[in-house]
Swiss-Prot record:
InterPro entries: Carn_acyl_trans (IPR000542), CAT-like_dom_sf (IPR023213), Cho/carn_acyl_trans (IPR039551), Cho/carn_acyl_trans_2 (IPR042231). Keywords: Acyltransferase, Fatty acid metabolism, Lipid metabolism, Membrane, Mitochondrion, Mitochondrion inner membrane, Peroxisome, Transferase, Transit peptide, Transport. Induction: By ethanol. Repressed by galactose. A motif (Microbody targeting signal) lies at residues 668-670. GO terms for cellular component: mitochondrial inner membrane; mitochondrion; peroxisome. GO terms for molecular function: carnitine O-acetyltransferase activity. This is Carnitine O-acetyltransferase, mitochondrial. The lineage of its organism: Eukaryota, Fungi, Dikarya, Ascomycota, Saccharomycotina. It comes from Saccharomyces cerevisiae (strain ATCC 204508 / S288c) (Baker's yeast). Present with 450 molecules/cell in log phase SD medium. Its EC number is 2.3.1.7. It comes from the Eukaryota. Gene3D superfamilies: Chloramphenicol acetyltransferase-like domain, Choline/Carnitine o-acyltransferase, domain 2.
């Protein structure tokens, strides 16, 4: 890749070695011939810009500076105490011990670890964490995401499917270009709030949450690294300097402006006219020259090799850089008209593998019948920030005055129409062959997955709270009971707990299987146990789950601590601790059931792939009046069925409902 300016290299010397390597691979010669330099934010991230953000912020009359105002006050991620972690581990392992001897072996392994390598690794981790506000950040980003080689779709990215707009907004909802205009215009308003730093800090239960993800949300992309590095990178650009989005249509990409030359957001009419032009251009162009997005569906090592080939040509290079620099991507899937929850979920999750650019951090989707959704690349952002964004977008769309909005769309606001620009790529025979291979691999990979949506309308959070339980903990019990009914055993179960109360916090594992959950599912399936005792076991298990999840959110889980300790091992250490090599230790974190909750009254779908090919991925939402789980697995690999789990989820939810209602009636008669 060409170096654009000699000053860049001197700036790079001030960066850490790993950052220099990543940044060096990203320095480019833009078609605009404007030099870009790495600038460090207050959060320690680096973005590429002609001028630092402060230059633009000082010129914004509405700049407030509140979005990131609490960042320096956030606590650093703590290193848990070793004894506490080992004690918690023993509690979580007990349900998987079939006899006393097995559990006693785990106790001996923990004792050996606590007396030998454990304290050494703990001291190393504390020393490593001493000058870092988040000791896990680099390890987690690289090892959990950037070094992961499987295709990021379907295996890493996650999606939201938006509910249809109310009937009185059908003029907007049923016209895909009008709907796309509304989405783009609304997201631009959100971007303006980011530029003004007027977005309020998220406060959860009185605690400010880390807002770092919002500085990394727009004008960013995952980037294939060098083949020899076996690792991807992330690249970030100034949110103030790149006022355009990328539109995907019929497998091609177009640059669509969102602001005028004075940094003023374009009108709805100017956005709509550009979208109309994209569709017109797309219908006239040669489809054989598209399909570049398919390459982002490849395993990462294959994509890195093809990426090198693409970057040899300056035309393709400029087009890729434009996509990376764009605020976000909007995919027009005008040949798709999903109706069922499963159809909508699949289109948002993976689509056709052609009309996407999976490396792009944010992709909104609009289909031919106006159905909309969202796909997120996961490496630098977890779900809560993008949930916030999508909630905002859907909320604003639901508030639109249809007549006023349609008038804005059809009324020209400028005599000079902005013209979108198709992003050209030079497709050599080698690249063409890679595109064909990518599309074949994509179809095969997606074909291995089953997806079924469990949307349960009998009750929701209102009913659960009335019976004194946390809705999240309750649905975890429904899942445990359904799995136990289906497979006659419990499986290691993961629930994501947010640690955003800490600086650059992401997630910790909530272990859903416990002695309490084993007692609950065992008693529930035992016909000799009285209903009152079953309900007591249910409530006790739910309470225990809430306690564990609270500890996890406070940074005091088990799994991230073990992850950190493993990273403290050195090549000259005598041996790997026996605990880390133990089959049961490793089985306990083999997430055969992976779960996570992100809920919105504006979504009718949310999901992602299973974490382990032998298990299920269960993404769930909780509404006041309904429950929703997106069920995904690989049936041929796992030998399990999404349809059967769907059945047992309904059976479990029905039985618990009947038991709670009947117990209430019994008590009322006393």
């Amino acid at each position: 890749m060409r170096i654009c300016h000699s000053r860049t290299l001197s700036n790079l010397k001030d960066l850490p070695i790993t950052s220099r390597r990543a940044m060096h691979s990203a320095i480019v010669n833009y078609s605009t011939q404007k030099a870009q330099f790495p600038v460090e934010t207050n959060n320690g991230e680096h973005y590429w810009a002609e001028k630092p953000n402060k230059f633009y912020q000082n010129k914004r009359p509405n700049f407030q500076g509140i979005t990131f105002a609490k960042q320096q006050d956030l606590p650093s991620l703590p290193v848990p105490e070793l004894k506490s972690t080992l004690d918690k581990y023993l509690q979580t392992i007990r349900p998987f011990c079939n006899d006393v001897e097995t559990f006693e072996r785990q106790q001996l392994l923990c004792k050996d670890f606590s007396e030998h390598m454990g304290p050494i690794l703990q001291d190393r981790l504390k020393e490593y964490a001493n000058d870092k506000r988040n000791w896990m950040a680099k390890f987690w980003d690289e090892q959990s995401y950037l070094q992961y080689n499987d295709p990021i779709v379907p295996y890493v990215s996650y999606f939201y499917s938006h509910m249809p707009l109310p009937n009185h907004l059908s003029k907007i909802d049923n016209d895909p270009l009008i709907k796309a205009t509304a989405i783009i215009s609304t997201v631009v308003k959100f971007i303006e709030a980011i530029k003004d730093e007027s977005l309020p800090v998220e406060i959860i239960k009185g605690m400010p949450f880390c807002m770092n993800s919002f500085s990394l949300m727009f004008n960013t992309s995952r980037l294939p690294g060098k083949p020899e590095d076996n690792q991807d990178t992330n690249i970030f650009y100034s949110v103030y300097e790149n006022n355009f989005v990328t539109i995907a249509y019929k497998g091609k990409f177009y640059k669509l402006m969102t602001h005028d030359g004075n940094d003023k957001p374009l009108s709805e009419n100017e956005i709509w006219r550009q979208l109309y032009s994209v569709v017109f251009q797309g219908s006239q162009s040669d489809p054989k020259l598209g399909g570049i997005g398919s390459l982002t569906s490849l395993p990462r090592d294959q994509w890195r090799e093809v990426h090198l080939e693409l970057m040899k040509d300056p035309i393709s290079q400029d087009s890729l850089e434009t996509i990376h620099k764009s605020s976000f991507m909007l995919c027009l899937d005008l040949d798709q008209s999903p109706v069922t929850l499963e159809e909508k979920s699949r289109n948002c999750w993976h689509g056709d593998g052609i009309n996407r650019f999976y490396d792009k951090s944010l992709q909104f989707l609009v289909t031919g019948n106006g159905s909309s959704g969202f796909l997120a690349e996961h490496s630098k952002m977890d779900g809560t920030p993008t949930l916030f964004l999508n909630n905002y977008v859907c909320q604003q769309l639901n508030k639109l005055d249809v007549d006023d909005f349609m008038r804005k769309v059809i009324t020209p606001s400028s005599t000079v129409a902005m013209k979108p620009m198709e992003l050209p790529f030079i497709i050599t025979p080698k690249i063409h062959k890679a595109i064909e291979s990518a599309q074949l691999q994509f179809k095969e990979t997606i074909g291995e997955h089953d997806l079924r949506v469990w949307h349960y309308n009998k009750y929701g959070k209102t009913f659960i709270k009335r019976h004194g339980m946390s809705p999240d903990a309750f649905i975890q019990q429904v899942i445990q009971l359904a799995v136990f009914k289906y497979l006659k055993r419990q499986l290691p179960t993961y629930e994501a707990a947010s640690t955003r109360k800490y600086f650059k916090g992401r997630t910790e594992t909530g272990r859903s299987v416990s002695t309490a959950s084993l007692e609950f599912v065992s008693k529930w399936q035992n016909g000799d146990v009285p209903i009152a005792e079953k309900i007591q076991a249910l409530k006790h298990s739910a309470k225990e789950h809430s306690t564990y999840l609270k500890n996890a959110a406070n940074g005091n889980g088990v799994d991230r601590h073990f992850f950190g300790l493993k990273n403290m091992l050195k090549s000259n250490d005598d041996q790997i601790p026996p605990l880390f090599k133990d089959p049961l230790f490793n089985y306990s974190s083999t997430w055969l059931i992976s779960t996570s909750q992100l809920s919105s009254e504006y979504f009718d779908g949310y999901g992602w792939s299973q974490v382990n090919d032998n298990g299920f991925g269960l993404a769930y939402m909780l509404n006041n009046e309904w429950l929703h789980i997106n069920i995904v697995n690989k049936p041929a690999k796992s030998g399990a069925s999404v349809n059967r789990l769907h059945y047992y989820l309904s059976q479990a939810a029905d039985e618990i409902f009947d038991a709670l209602e009947n117990e209430n009636k019994r008590k009322a008669k006393l």
